[in-house]
From Swiss-Prot:
The gene is hisB. It comes from Methanoregula boonei (strain DSM 21154 / JCM 14090 / 6A8). It is found in: Cytoplasm. Keywords: Amino-acid biosynthesis, Cytoplasm, Histidine biosynthesis, Lyase. PROSITE patterns: IGP_DEHYDRATASE_1, IGP_DEHYDRATASE_2. It comes from the Archaea. This is Imidazoleglycerol-phosphate dehydratase.
C-alpha cells in the first residue's frame, strides 16, 4: 500500500511517500546530509520505497527536522499497516558494520514503545547531536504504533548509527511483509 502524506508547521514542511511493498527506491532530501544517508540505508535495505522532502528551520538546529520526519514517517507506516491483515507483525535483524553491531526487534501491533540501548562517543554525528537519533526512533514508534527494541555497540559512531538504521529498516520490511499464510489480523484479540 503506497501512502503519501504532507505536514506543514511553522518549523517544517514535509512531503513523504512510503510503500512497504516497494523495491527499495529512495529519494530523501531533508537538508541534513548525514540524516539523508541514514534514511536511505534504512529504506534501501528494508526493501521499501521512500521519498521524503523536508524544508526545516535548520538555522535553529536539526531537532525539528528530525523529529517531524519521525512523526510523518510514523504516521505513514501506521496508515500502511491499517488493520494489519496478513502482515507478519514481528521481525528482528542483527546487522554488523565492521566493529559495530546493531540489533533491532519490532512488533508492529499498534503499541508504540521504544527501548534504546547504546551510546555514541562523539558530541555530534554528521552535525547532529546523537540524542536526536533516539528521539527520531521514539517519535516514529509512537506515531507508527510500533514497539522497538534497539541495541547497538561498537567503537565507530558512524558505523554504529548506520548499522542501527539498516537493522531497523530490514526488521520493518520483514514485519510489514505479507505472511502468505493468512489474511487475518495477526492478533489473538482480533484487532491491534
Amino acid at each position: 500500500m503506497n501512502v503519501s502524506l504532507a505536514r506543514e508547521t511553522k518549523e517544517t514542511k514535509i512531503a513523504l511517500t512510503f510503500d512497504p511493498e516497494g523495491t527499495g527506491k529512495v529519494a530523501v532530501e531533508t537538508g541534513i546530509p548525514f540524516f539523508d544517508h541514514m534514511l536511505t540505508g534504512m529504506a534501501r535495505h528494508g526493501g521499501f520505497d521512500l521519498t521524503c522532502t523536508v524544508t526545516g528551520d535548520l538555522g535553529v538546529d536539526s531537532h525539528h527536522t528530525i523529529e517531524d520526519t519521525g512523526i510523518v514517517l510514523g504516521d505513514a507506516i501506521k496508515a500502511a499497516i491499517g488493520e494489519g491483515r496478513g502482515i507478519r507483525r514481528f521481525a528482528h535483524a542483527i546487522i554488523p558494520m565492521d566493529e559495530s553491531l546493531a540489533q533491532v526487534a519490532l512488533d508492529c501491533g499498534g503499541r508504540g514503545y521504544l527501548v534504546y540501548t547504546g551510546t555514541f562517543g562523539a558530541r555530534t554525528l554528521g552535525n547532529i547531536p546523537p540524542d536526536l537519533f533516539e528521539h527520531f526512533f521514539y517519535t516514529l514508534c509512537i506515531h507508527a504504533g510500533i514497539t522497538a527494541h534497539i541495541r547497538f555497540t561498537g567503537r565507530n559512531d558512524h558505523h554504529q548509527c548506520e548499522a542501527m538504521f539498516k537493522a531497523f529498516g530490514i526488521a520493518l520490511g520483514e514485519a510489514l511483509a505479507k505472511s502468505g499464510k493468512t489474511k487475518e489480523i495477526p492478533s489473538t484479540k482480533g484487532t491491534f
